[in-house]
Protein backbone atom coordinates (compact mmCIF):
# COMPACT_ATOMS: atom_id res chain seq x y z
CA UNK A 1 0.00 0.00 0.00
CA UNK A 2 1.38 3.39 -0.97
CA UNK A 3 2.30 5.84 1.78
CA UNK A 4 1.83 8.88 -0.49
CA UNK A 5 -0.85 11.34 0.57
CA UNK A 6 -2.86 13.70 -1.58
CA UNK A 7 -5.09 16.64 -0.73
CA UNK A 8 -7.52 15.81 -3.53
CA UNK A 9 -10.16 13.32 -2.33
CA UNK A 10 -11.54 10.73 -4.71
CA UNK A 11 -15.13 11.24 -5.78
CA UNK A 12 -16.17 7.97 -4.18
CA UNK A 13 -14.15 8.29 -0.95
CA UNK A 14 -16.13 8.61 2.29
CA UNK A 15 -16.07 11.87 4.20
CA UNK A 16 -14.10 12.04 7.41
CA UNK A 17 -16.02 12.89 10.56
CA UNK A 18 -14.54 16.38 10.63
CA UNK A 19 -15.41 17.00 6.96
CA UNK A 20 -18.98 15.91 7.60
CA UNK A 21 -19.29 18.27 10.56
CA UNK A 22 -17.86 21.18 8.57
CA UNK A 23 -20.29 20.47 5.74
CA UNK A 24 -23.22 20.45 8.12
CA UNK A 25 -22.06 23.69 9.74
CA UNK A 26 -22.03 25.44 6.35
CA UNK A 27 -25.77 24.82 5.99
CA UNK A 28 -26.81 25.69 9.53
CA UNK A 29 -26.46 28.82 11.69
CA UNK A 30 -23.44 28.43 13.95
CA UNK A 31 -24.19 28.87 17.64
CA UNK A 32 -20.48 29.30 18.37
CA UNK A 33 -17.51 30.36 16.26
CA UNK A 34 -16.05 27.51 14.20
CA UNK A 35 -12.75 27.63 16.08
CA UNK A 36 -14.50 26.86 19.41
CA UNK A 37 -17.09 24.41 18.12
CA UNK A 38 -16.85 21.42 20.52
CA UNK A 39 -18.42 18.95 18.08
CA UNK A 40 -15.93 19.85 15.35
CA UNK A 41 -13.06 19.68 17.85
CA UNK A 42 -14.19 16.24 18.99
CA UNK A 43 -14.41 14.99 15.39
CA UNK A 44 -10.92 16.29 14.63
CA UNK A 45 -9.55 14.83 17.87
CA UNK A 46 -10.92 11.41 16.96
CA UNK A 47 -9.04 11.56 13.65
CA UNK A 48 -5.80 12.81 15.18
CA UNK A 49 -4.68 10.52 18.03
CA UNK A 50 -2.48 13.20 19.62
CA UNK A 51 -5.08 15.98 19.74
CA UNK A 52 -7.11 17.01 22.78
CA UNK A 53 -10.07 19.39 22.23
CA UNK A 54 -9.21 22.99 23.11
CA UNK A 55 -12.04 23.35 25.64
CA UNK A 56 -10.68 20.49 27.80
CA UNK A 57 -9.84 21.87 31.30
CA UNK A 58 -6.14 22.35 31.94
CA UNK A 59 -6.19 20.04 34.98
CA UNK A 60 -7.59 17.22 32.83
CA UNK A 61 -4.98 17.90 30.15
CA UNK A 62 -2.18 17.64 32.72
CA UNK A 63 -3.60 14.42 34.17
CA UNK A 64 -3.97 12.86 30.71
CA UNK A 65 -0.39 13.81 29.83
CA UNK A 66 0.92 12.30 33.07
CA UNK A 67 -1.12 9.12 32.61
CA UNK A 68 0.01 8.76 29.00
CA UNK A 69 3.68 8.94 29.89
CA UNK A 70 3.18 6.27 32.52
CA UNK A 71 1.05 3.98 30.36
CA UNK A 72 2.95 4.03 27.08
CA UNK A 73 6.42 3.92 28.57
CA UNK A 74 7.76 7.43 28.20
CA UNK A 75 7.72 10.39 25.86
CA UNK A 76 6.56 10.14 22.25
CA UNK A 77 9.72 10.85 20.28
CA UNK A 78 9.81 8.64 17.17
CA UNK A 79 8.11 8.56 13.77
CA UNK A 80 6.89 5.37 12.17
CA UNK A 81 9.71 5.10 9.62
CA UNK A 82 12.31 5.52 12.37
CA UNK A 83 10.82 2.70 14.43
CA UNK A 84 10.48 0.37 11.44
CA UNK A 85 14.03 1.13 10.30
CA UNK A 86 15.53 0.37 13.71
CA UNK A 87 13.66 -2.95 13.80
CA UNK A 88 15.03 -3.73 10.35
CA UNK A 89 11.67 -4.21 8.63
CA UNK A 90 9.82 -2.42 5.88
CA UNK A 91 7.22 0.16 6.82
CA UNK A 92 4.65 -2.09 5.15
CA UNK A 93 5.42 -4.99 7.50
CA UNK A 94 5.52 -2.75 10.56
CA UNK A 95 2.16 -1.22 9.66
CA UNK A 96 0.58 -4.67 9.42
CA UNK A 97 1.64 -5.42 12.99
CA UNK A 98 0.55 -2.00 14.27
CA UNK A 99 -2.83 -2.30 12.62
CA UNK A 100 -3.27 -5.77 14.12
CA UNK A 101 -2.82 -4.40 17.62
CA UNK A 102 -5.15 -1.49 16.91
CA UNK A 103 -2.95 1.55 16.25
CA UNK A 104 -4.50 4.36 14.18
CA UNK A 105 -3.30 5.26 10.70
CA UNK A 106 -0.39 7.69 10.97
CA UNK A 107 1.39 10.02 8.60
CA UNK A 108 5.15 9.95 8.14
CA UNK A 109 5.69 13.12 10.17
CA UNK A 110 3.64 12.25 13.27
CA UNK A 111 5.73 11.74 16.38
CA UNK A 112 3.78 8.89 17.95
CA UNK A 113 6.09 6.13 19.19
CA UNK A 114 8.10 5.58 22.38
CA UNK A 115 11.04 3.40 23.34
CA UNK A 116 8.52 0.81 24.54
CA UNK A 117 6.96 0.72 21.07
CA UNK A 118 10.38 0.14 19.52
CA UNK A 119 11.03 -2.71 21.93
CA UNK A 120 7.64 -4.34 21.23
CA UNK A 121 8.11 -4.23 17.46
CA UNK A 122 11.66 -5.53 17.82
CA UNK A 123 10.42 -8.45 19.93
CA UNK A 124 7.85 -9.56 17.36
CA UNK A 125 10.22 -9.10 14.43
CA UNK A 126 12.91 -11.06 16.30
CA UNK A 127 10.57 -14.01 16.86
CA UNK A 128 9.78 -14.12 13.14
CA UNK A 129 13.45 -13.91 12.15
CA UNK A 130 14.40 -16.68 14.57
CA UNK A 131 11.75 -18.93 13.04
CA UNK A 132 9.62 -19.16 16.18
CA UNK A 133 6.69 -17.57 14.33
CA UNK A 134 5.67 -16.88 10.76
CA UNK A 135 4.71 -13.31 9.93
CA UNK A 136 1.07 -14.39 9.61
CA UNK A 137 1.13 -15.95 13.08
CA UNK A 138 2.80 -12.87 14.58
CA UNK A 139 0.03 -10.70 13.14
CA UNK A 140 -2.60 -13.08 14.52
CA UNK A 141 -1.04 -12.96 18.00
CA UNK A 142 -0.90 -9.17 17.89
CA UNK A 143 -4.52 -9.03 16.78
CA UNK A 144 -5.59 -11.33 19.62
CA UNK A 145 -3.88 -9.08 22.17
CA UNK A 146 -5.20 -5.89 20.58
CA UNK A 147 -8.81 -6.99 20.28
CA UNK A 148 -9.07 -8.62 23.69
CA UNK A 149 -7.38 -5.81 25.61
CA UNK A 150 -9.42 -3.19 23.75
CA UNK A 151 -12.66 -4.83 24.89
CA UNK A 152 -11.24 -5.40 28.37
CA UNK A 153 -10.24 -1.76 28.85
CA UNK A 154 -13.65 -0.48 27.73
CA UNK A 155 -15.32 -2.97 30.09
CA UNK A 156 -13.14 -1.91 33.04
CA UNK A 157 -13.63 1.81 32.47
CA UNK A 158 -17.40 1.46 32.19
CA UNK A 159 -17.51 -0.71 35.33
CA UNK A 160 -15.59 1.94 37.28
CA UNK A 161 -17.80 4.75 35.96
CA UNK A 162 -20.97 2.82 36.82
CA UNK A 163 -19.65 2.24 40.33
CA UNK A 164 -18.99 5.96 40.83
CA UNK A 165 -22.43 6.90 39.54
CA UNK A 166 -24.15 4.38 41.80
CA UNK A 167 -22.13 4.85 44.99
CA UNK A 168 -20.84 8.44 44.87
CA UNK A 169 -23.96 10.13 43.48
CA UNK A 170 -22.05 11.51 40.48
CA UNK A 171 -23.30 12.25 37.00
CA UNK A 172 -21.80 10.30 34.10
CA UNK A 173 -19.61 13.27 33.15
CA UNK A 174 -18.47 13.84 36.74
CA UNK A 175 -17.62 10.17 37.15
CA UNK A 176 -15.49 10.13 34.01
CA UNK A 177 -13.61 13.23 35.19
CA UNK A 178 -13.10 11.67 38.62
CA UNK A 179 -11.77 8.50 37.03
CA UNK A 180 -8.68 10.41 35.83
CA UNK A 181 -7.70 10.85 39.49
CA UNK A 182 -8.49 7.25 40.44
CA UNK A 183 -6.61 5.49 37.63
CA UNK A 184 -3.05 6.26 38.83
CA UNK A 185 -3.89 4.55 42.14
CA UNK A 186 -5.28 1.33 40.65
CA UNK A 187 -3.20 0.81 37.49
CA UNK A 188 -0.47 -1.28 39.21
CA UNK A 189 -3.00 -3.64 40.80
CA UNK A 190 -4.98 -4.11 37.58
CA UNK A 191 -1.77 -4.65 35.61
CA UNK A 192 -0.65 -7.35 38.07
CA UNK A 193 -4.08 -9.00 37.90
CA UNK A 194 -3.95 -9.01 34.09
CA UNK A 195 -0.63 -10.86 34.01
CA UNK A 196 -1.77 -13.20 36.80
CA UNK A 197 -5.00 -14.03 34.97
CA UNK A 198 -3.23 -14.52 31.62
CA UNK A 199 -0.78 -16.99 33.18
CA UNK A 200 -3.61 -18.87 34.89
CA UNK A 201 -5.66 -19.03 31.68
CA UNK A 202 -2.64 -20.21 29.67
CA UNK A 203 -1.97 -22.89 32.26
CA UNK A 204 -5.58 -24.08 31.98
CA UNK A 205 -5.27 -24.15 28.19
CA UNK A 206 -2.07 -26.21 28.42
CA UNK A 207 -3.80 -28.75 30.65
CA UNK A 208 -6.77 -28.97 28.30
CA UNK A 209 -4.48 -29.42 25.33
CA UNK A 210 -1.93 -31.81 26.82
CA UNK A 211 -3.94 -33.88 29.27
CA UNK A 212 -7.50 -34.03 28.03
CA UNK A 213 -7.74 -33.58 24.28
CA UNK A 214 -6.81 -37.19 23.55
CA UNK A 215 -9.35 -38.48 26.07
CA UNK A 216 -12.06 -36.28 24.58
CA UNK A 217 -11.39 -37.33 21.00
CA UNK A 218 -11.19 -41.00 21.99
CA UNK A 219 -14.57 -40.79 23.73
CA UNK A 220 -16.08 -39.07 20.70
CA UNK A 221 -14.67 -41.68 18.31
CA UNK A 222 -15.96 -44.52 20.48
CA UNK A 223 -19.48 -43.03 20.51
CA UNK A 224 -19.58 -42.46 16.77
CA UNK A 225 -17.48 -45.33 15.48
CA UNK A 226 -14.86 -43.06 13.87
CA UNK A 227 -11.12 -42.77 13.98
CA UNK A 228 -8.94 -39.68 14.20
CA UNK A 229 -7.35 -40.00 10.78
CA UNK A 230 -6.97 -36.65 9.10
CA UNK A 231 -10.10 -34.97 10.48
CA UNK A 232 -10.24 -31.21 9.87
CA UNK A 233 -12.08 -30.82 13.21
CA UNK A 234 -9.55 -31.97 15.80
CA UNK A 235 -11.30 -31.11 19.09
CA UNK A 236 -14.12 -33.06 20.73
CA UNK A 237 -16.17 -30.82 23.00
CA UNK A 238 -19.65 -30.28 24.36
CA UNK A 239 -20.99 -27.06 22.83
CA UNK A 240 -23.81 -25.22 24.53
CA UNK A 241 -25.95 -22.13 24.08
CA UNK A 242 -28.19 -20.32 26.57
CA UNK A 243 -30.61 -17.73 25.24
CA UNK A 244 -32.96 -15.14 26.77
CA UNK A 245 -36.43 -15.56 25.28
CA UNK A 246 -38.20 -12.44 23.88
CA UNK A 247 -35.09 -10.31 24.46
CA UNK A 248 -35.77 -8.04 21.47
CA UNK A 249 -39.26 -7.04 22.59
CA UNK A 250 -38.06 -6.73 26.19
CA UNK A 251 -35.20 -4.42 25.21
CA UNK A 252 -37.64 -2.04 23.51
CA UNK A 253 -39.49 -1.56 26.81
CA UNK A 254 -36.37 -0.90 28.91
CA UNK A 255 -34.32 2.25 29.25
CA UNK A 256 -30.63 2.03 28.38
CA UNK A 257 -29.34 1.72 31.94
CA UNK A 258 -31.79 -1.03 32.91
CA UNK A 259 -31.02 -2.94 29.72
CA UNK A 260 -27.28 -2.65 30.40
CA UNK A 261 -27.80 -4.00 33.92
CA UNK A 262 -29.81 -6.93 32.54
CA UNK A 263 -27.11 -7.86 30.00
CA UNK A 264 -24.29 -7.49 32.54
CA UNK A 265 -26.11 -9.59 35.11
CA UNK A 266 -26.91 -12.26 32.52
CA UNK A 267 -23.31 -12.48 31.38
CA UNK A 268 -21.94 -12.51 34.94
CA UNK A 269 -24.36 -15.22 36.07
CA UNK A 270 -23.65 -17.40 33.04
CA UNK A 271 -19.89 -16.96 33.42
CA UNK A 272 -20.09 -18.04 37.06
CA UNK A 273 -22.12 -21.17 36.31
CA UNK A 274 -19.96 -22.17 33.35
CA UNK A 275 -16.81 -21.73 35.45
CA UNK A 276 -18.21 -23.81 38.34
CA UNK A 277 -19.04 -26.55 35.82
CA UNK A 278 -15.49 -26.60 34.47
CA UNK A 279 -16.46 -25.14 31.10
CA UNK A 280 -15.22 -22.15 29.14
CA UNK A 281 -17.29 -19.14 28.14
CA UNK A 282 -16.50 -18.59 24.46
CA UNK A 283 -18.48 -15.40 23.92
CA UNK A 284 -21.64 -13.50 24.73
CA UNK A 285 -23.83 -11.79 22.14
CA UNK A 286 -26.27 -9.64 24.07
CA UNK A 287 -29.00 -12.14 24.90
CA UNK A 288 -27.01 -15.32 24.24
CA UNK A 289 -23.96 -17.12 25.61
CA UNK A 290 -21.84 -19.76 23.87
CA UNK A 291 -19.72 -22.12 25.96
CA UNK A 292 -17.77 -25.36 25.68
CA UNK A 293 -17.03 -28.21 28.09
CA UNK A 294 -14.66 -31.11 27.76
CA UNK A 295 -17.14 -33.95 28.28
CA UNK A 296 -20.80 -34.39 27.35
CA UNK A 297 -21.62 -34.87 31.03
CA UNK A 298 -20.01 -31.57 32.01
CA UNK A 299 -21.78 -29.78 29.16
CA UNK A 300 -25.13 -31.25 30.21
CA UNK A 301 -24.62 -30.26 33.85
CA UNK A 302 -23.82 -26.69 32.81
CA UNK A 303 -26.84 -26.51 30.50
CA UNK A 304 -29.23 -27.68 33.22
CA UNK A 305 -27.68 -25.39 35.83
CA UNK A 306 -27.98 -22.38 33.53
CA UNK A 307 -31.65 -23.16 32.97
CA UNK A 308 -32.32 -23.68 36.68
CA UNK A 309 -30.37 -20.73 38.08
CA UNK A 310 -31.49 -18.17 35.49
CA UNK A 311 -35.12 -19.15 36.11
CA UNK A 312 -34.69 -18.23 39.79
CA UNK A 313 -33.78 -14.62 38.95
CA UNK A 314 -36.86 -12.42 38.57
CA UNK A 315 -34.93 -9.90 36.48
CA UNK A 316 -34.55 -12.35 33.59
CA UNK A 317 -37.23 -13.44 31.13
CA UNK A 318 -37.47 -17.15 30.44
CA UNK A 319 -34.43 -18.87 28.98
CA UNK A 320 -33.85 -21.81 26.66
CA UNK A 321 -30.77 -23.74 25.69
CA UNK A 322 -29.11 -26.64 23.94
CA UNK A 323 -25.98 -28.74 24.31
CA UNK A 324 -24.36 -31.00 21.68
CA UNK A 325 -21.29 -33.26 21.91
CA UNK A 326 -19.09 -33.37 18.81
CA UNK A 327 -16.04 -32.18 16.96
CA UNK A 328 -15.18 -28.55 16.36
CA UNK A 329 -12.45 -26.20 15.18
CA UNK A 330 -11.09 -23.47 17.45
CA UNK A 331 -9.76 -20.33 15.76
CA UNK A 332 -9.30 -16.68 16.79
CA UNK A 333 -10.81 -17.39 20.20
CA UNK A 334 -14.05 -18.64 18.62
CA UNK A 335 -15.32 -22.10 17.67
CA UNK A 336 -16.66 -23.41 14.37
CA UNK A 337 -18.15 -26.51 12.82
CA UNK A 338 -21.38 -28.50 12.45
CA UNK A 339 -21.53 -29.17 16.19
CA UNK A 340 -21.77 -25.43 16.88
CA UNK A 341 -24.39 -25.02 14.17
CA UNK A 342 -26.45 -27.92 15.52
CA UNK A 343 -26.41 -26.48 19.04
CA UNK A 344 -27.53 -23.10 17.69
CA UNK A 345 -30.38 -24.65 15.68
CA UNK A 346 -31.58 -26.69 18.66
CA UNK A 347 -31.54 -23.59 20.87
CA UNK A 348 -33.89 -21.83 18.47
CA UNK A 349 -36.20 -24.89 18.55
CA UNK A 350 -36.27 -25.20 22.34
CA UNK A 351 -39.37 -24.14 24.24
CA UNK A 352 -38.88 -21.52 26.99
CA UNK A 353 -37.49 -23.15 30.11
CA UNK A 354 -36.14 -26.24 28.32
CA UNK A 355 -32.81 -27.63 27.11
CA UNK A 356 -32.50 -29.71 23.93
CA UNK A 357 -29.81 -32.06 22.65
CA UNK A 358 -29.35 -34.29 19.61
CA UNK A 359 -29.80 -38.06 19.39
CA UNK A 360 -26.11 -38.98 19.56
CA UNK A 361 -25.47 -36.80 22.61
CA UNK A 362 -28.62 -38.21 24.21
CA UNK A 363 -27.34 -41.74 23.62
CA UNK A 364 -24.04 -40.82 25.28
CA UNK A 365 -25.86 -39.52 28.37
CA UNK A 366 -28.61 -42.15 28.51
CA UNK A 367 -27.02 -44.43 31.12
CA UNK A 368 -26.13 -41.55 33.46
CA UNK A 369 -28.74 -41.32 36.24
CA UNK A 370 -28.14 -37.57 36.57
CA UNK A 371 -29.95 -36.96 33.28
CA UNK A 372 -33.38 -37.70 31.85
CA UNK A 373 -33.73 -37.74 28.04
CA UNK A 374 -37.17 -37.36 26.48
CA UNK A 375 -37.58 -37.82 22.72
CA UNK A 376 -39.30 -34.98 20.86
CA UNK A 377 -40.96 -34.92 17.45
CA UNK A 378 -38.65 -35.45 14.48
CA UNK A 379 -38.00 -32.00 13.04
CA UNK A 380 -36.54 -30.67 9.80
CA UNK A 381 -33.53 -28.51 10.64
CA UNK A 382 -31.86 -26.29 8.07
CA UNK A 383 -28.52 -27.75 7.03
CA UNK A 384 -29.11 -31.08 8.79
CA UNK A 385 -32.36 -32.48 7.39
CA UNK A 386 -34.68 -34.42 9.69
CA UNK A 387 -33.30 -34.83 13.21
CA UNK A 388 -34.55 -36.34 16.47
CA UNK A 389 -34.22 -33.75 19.27
CA UNK A 390 -34.28 -34.83 22.91
CA UNK A 391 -35.28 -32.72 25.88
CA UNK A 392 -32.62 -32.85 28.58
CA UNK A 393 -33.88 -32.76 32.19
CA UNK A 394 -32.31 -33.25 35.60
CA UNK A 395 -32.34 -36.74 37.07
CA UNK A 396 -30.75 -37.92 40.30
CA UNK A 397 -28.37 -35.73 42.29
CA UNK A 398 -28.27 -32.05 43.09
CA UNK A 399 -26.46 -30.92 39.94
CA UNK A 400 -23.89 -28.15 40.10
CA UNK A 401 -23.75 -26.34 43.42
CA UNK A 402 -23.86 -22.58 42.82
CA UNK A 403 -23.17 -20.48 45.93
Swiss-Prot record:
Catalytic activity: ATP = 3',5'-cyclic AMP + diphosphate
GO CC, any one term: cytoplasm
GO BP terms, alphabetized: cAMP biosynthetic process; intracellular signal transduction
Biased composition (Polar residues): 1-16
Domain of life of the native organism: Bacteria
The protein's required cofactors: Mg(2+)
UniProt entry tagged with the keyword Nucleus: no
InterPro entries: A/G_cyclase, Ad_Cy_reg, Nucleotide_cyclase
SUPFAM superfamilies xref list: Nucleotide cyclase
Major place of residence: cytoplasm
Entry note: cofactor: Binds 1 Mg(2+) ion per subunit.
Keywords (A to Z) from UniProt: ATP-binding, cAMP biosynthesis, Cytoplasm, Lyase, Magnesium, Metal-binding, Nucleotide-binding
EC number: 4.6.1.1
Region (Disordered): 1-37
Signal peptide per UniProt: none
Compartment(s) where it occurs, according to its Swiss-Prot or TrEMBL record: Cytoplasm
Binding site for Mg(2+): 243, 287
Domain Guanylate cyclase per the UniProt entry, residue ranges: 238-347
Known regulation of activity: Pyruvate-stimulated.
Similarity remark: Belongs to the adenylyl cyclase class-3 family.
Subunit (UniProt): Homodimer.
Function field: Plays essential roles in regulation of cellular metabolism by catalyzing the synthesis of a second messenger, cAMP.
Descriptive protein name: Adenylate cyclase
Gene that encodes the chain: cya
Amino acid sequence: MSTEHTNTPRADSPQSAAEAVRGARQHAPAATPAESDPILELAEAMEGPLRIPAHTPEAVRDTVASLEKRLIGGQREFRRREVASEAGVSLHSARKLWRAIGFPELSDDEVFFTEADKKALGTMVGMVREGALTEETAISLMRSVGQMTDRMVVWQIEALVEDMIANQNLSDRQARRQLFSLLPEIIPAIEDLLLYSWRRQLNSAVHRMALRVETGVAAYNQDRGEDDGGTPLPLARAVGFADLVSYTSLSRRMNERTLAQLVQRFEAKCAEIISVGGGRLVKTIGDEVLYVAETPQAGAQIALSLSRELAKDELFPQTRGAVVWGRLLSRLGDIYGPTVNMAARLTSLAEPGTVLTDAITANTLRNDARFVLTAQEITAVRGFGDIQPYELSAGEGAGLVID
